[in-house]
Amino acid sequence: MAARILLINGPNLNLLGTREPSVYGSTTLADVVAQAKTQAASLNVHLEAFQSNHEGAIVDRIHEARGAVDAIVINPGAYTHTSVAIRDALLGVDIPFVETHISNVHAREEWRRHSYFSDKAVAVICGLGTYGYTAAIEFAARHMKMKDRV
């Protein structure tokens, strides 16, 4: 059975391609998801994508992932800096997760430099543009294989 990754995108990421292209680029979320699915398939991994602008919907989707996915790749968007609820959901389901950001959050406003997720993530990828999703999926796939060997 192929490994399973859930890709979660948080608020405003549905506006990729048109929202602040100088920061986030011109690639759309549909493009990101298509590229992520292609990358996952090349690694013999099944990828499901989910996006929501609502914290509770993200929490619910994480809960639904318990026992159904092997890893989560999450770009929490602005919830990175505010959501204890999403953090607790991730910890509650005990699924390894990779935190990813399109921009380098450490080179932006001071308030963007704190993450409620980084200390619990198996990896954090930021500042690579949308390529960060490819890197996150590849890392998650490798992490799952290494975990299976232990």
UniProtKB/Swiss-Prot annotation:
Top-level taxon: Eukaryota
Instruction: Output the GO biological process annotations, alphabetical, semicolon-separated.
Output: 3,4-dihydroxybenzoate biosynthetic process; quinate catabolic process
Pathway assignment reads: Aromatic compound metabolism; 3,4-dihydroxybenzoate biosynthesis; 3,4-dihydroxybenzoate from 3-dehydroquinate: step 1/2
Gene Ontology MF terms in the entry: 3-dehydroquinate dehydratase activity
Q: Does the keyword Lyase apply?
A: yes
Gene3D superfamilies recorded for this chain? Dehydroquinase, class II
Return the broad EC class.
lyase
For this UniProt record, give its keywords in alphabetical order, as a comma-separated list.
Lyase, Quinate metabolism
Q: List the disulfide bonds.
A: none
Keyword Cell division (UniProt): no
Binding sites annotated in the UniProt record for substrate: N75, H81, D88, I102, S103, R112
The enzyme's E.C. designation: 4.2.1.10
PROSITE patterns documented for this protein: DEHYDROQUINASE_II
Where is the site described as Transition state stabilizer found in this chain?
R19
Q: Which Pfam families did the record assign?
A: DHquinase_II
Instruction: Quickly give the catalysed reaction.
Output: 3-dehydroquinate = 3-dehydroshikimate + H2O
Active-site residues are Y24, H101
This molecule's function is given as:
Is involved in the catabolism of quinate. Allows the utilization of quinate as carbon source via the beta-ketoadipate pathway.
Q: Belongs to which family?
A: Belongs to the type-II 3-dehydroquinase family.
Summarize subunit and interaction data from the UniProt record for this chain.
Homododecamer. Adopts a ring-like structure, composed of an arrangement of two hexameric rings stacked on top of one another.
PANTHER family in the record: CATABOLIC 3-DEHYDROQUINASE
**Any idea what this protein is called?**
Catabolic 3-dehydroquinase
Species source reads: Verticillium alfalfae (strain VaMs.102 / ATCC MYA-4576 / FGSC 10136)
Lineage start? Eukaryota, Fungi, Dikarya, Ascomycota, Pezizomycotina
As recorded in Swiss-Prot or TrEMBL, the protein's gene is named qutE
